[in-house]
Amino acid sequence: MKKAVVLLSGGLDSTTTLAIARGNGFACYALSVDYGQRHAAELAAATRIGQLLQVCEHQFLKLDLTVLASSALTDPSVTVPIHGTNRGIPATYVPARNTIMLSLALAWAEVLGSQDIFIGVTAVDYSGYPDCRPDYIDAFEKMANLATKAGREGNLLKVHAPLINLPKHDIIRRGLELGIDYSMTVSCYQADASGWACGQCDACHIRRAGFAAANIPDPTYYQDKR
Amino acid sequence: MKKAVVLLSGGLDSTTTLAIARGNGFACYALSVDYGQRHAAELAAATRIGQLLQVCEHQFLKLDLTVLASSALTDPSVTVPIHGTNRGIPATYVPARNTIMLSLALAWAEVLGSQDIFIGVTAVDYSGYPDCRPDYIDAFEKMANLATKAGREGNLLKVHAPLINLPKHDIIRRGLELGIDYSMTVSCYQADASGWACGQCDACHIRRAGFAAANIPDPTYYQDKR
């Protein structure tokens, strides 16, 4: 079995990505990065998902970006924006987040002798994020193949972004086909300690709209449905 | 004054790079990454150098790569190779190290509104490292400009690698012109707690040979000269 490093946040997209990697026959090594998020609920969800989907190994890397960054996701003094109030690049954007996470995945892939990295970015719902677009993923892959022993020796690394062109409702349908229980995942930017979602932030809005568009009951634990 | 993020390990190359950035008129923000190195001497040197060269701000980021990697620099069970015993890519290679460090510099540059990152890689002395070559630096820069808000908006980021084509003796001459006291820097892979260099590892060998080739007395504190 070929090994793959899968970036796993515990949200809907990365969980579906892990299920896809597994469904494609890869031995999956999950990597979760705690870059100073405000909610432990996300990492708790990642732990659950790693166990449920039986990854070969699950590593958690702590990297406190709060000393560098001051975005809504890492700085408690900044309010998470309510959906619809921001334009362009969201205020919840963490600088260079995907570049940092892919770099860490690259390091582990090299150690494992893996040539495959999976990341659950999607260009459709999060079009405001520059590092979720196909040209970015291609550029990272090119750089990575010049950065490593393996790439230089012709064992080319592939960055898989299987959701990149899928709208949320198609991601949800794909995940349900693969047997995912989405009530176990947490997408919310400000979930409470038990993993209940706020129902108000951009991530909650996109998730709710996705289940509605897929015409599938939304199993998410929302605080306003408690 | 334009701001620059400068990656600073406290070794000869990164210290010279910082002096060059400063000499070019940049307001310098030093970033040191503790990726699980075995010696605290390197970080102590970085602290000293940051103070001596009067950086605007100096951030230390802790990132324990030892959970992922098992190279000589991070795994205490692996012996640091004595110079001349290894071929091709050195055993002291840390997977994706420069990619990770440049990614963190990219994050800080974006937060600071800086379009300039300095890194002290050199393709001459460390030709075994894939991520020290010009084509790698170019590829990182291309990727970075697709990864960030600033790059997408046309405010292009530049990755400066001013030493990349210089042999060690030219780096040393350049640094002395800029007033660097190289006795304050630590290059050794296994310096002791006080910063005394082993004199035996690849880094020590290259450093010693550099001073010899420059025909300049080597001010390094070597354990075998104690």
Curated annotation (Swiss-Prot), chains A, B:
Needed cofactors, names only, are: Zn(2+)
Pathway annotation: Purine metabolism; 7-cyano-7-deazaguanine biosynthesis
The GO biological-process annotations, alphabetized, read as: queuosine biosynthetic process
Pfam families listed in its UniProt record: QueC
EC number(s) reported in the record: 6.3.4.20
Molecular function in Gene Ontology? ATP binding; ligase activity, forming carbon-nitrogen bonds; zinc ion binding
The note on cofactor binding and number reads: Binds 1 zinc ion per subunit.
Name the positions where ATP binds.
L8, S9, G10, G11, L12, D13, S14, T15, T16, T17, L18
| SUPFAM superfamilies assigned | Adenine nucleotide alpha hydrolases-like (SSF52402)
Record-listed Zn(2+) binding positions: C188, C198, C201, C204
Disulfide bond residue pairs: none
Q: Which reaction does it catalyse?
A: 7-carboxy-7-deazaguanine + NH4(+) + ATP = 7-cyano-7-deazaguanine + ADP + phosphate + H2O + H(+)
Task: Recite the UniProt keywords alphabetically.
Answer: ATP-binding, Ligase, Metal-binding, Nucleotide-binding, Queuosine biosynthesis, Zinc
Function statement? Catalyzes the ATP-dependent conversion of 7-carboxy-7-deazaguanine (CDG) to 7-cyano-7-deazaguanine (preQ(0)).
Q: Which PANTHER family match?
A: 7-CYANO-7-DEAZAGUANINE SYNTHASE
Family of this protein: Belongs to the QueC family.
Q: What is this protein called?
A: 7-cyano-7-deazaguanine synthase
The organism encoding this protein is: Nitrosomonas eutropha (strain DSM 101675 / C91 / Nm57)
* Taxonomic classification: Bacteria, Pseudomonadati, Pseudomonadota, Betaproteobacteria, Nitrosomonadales
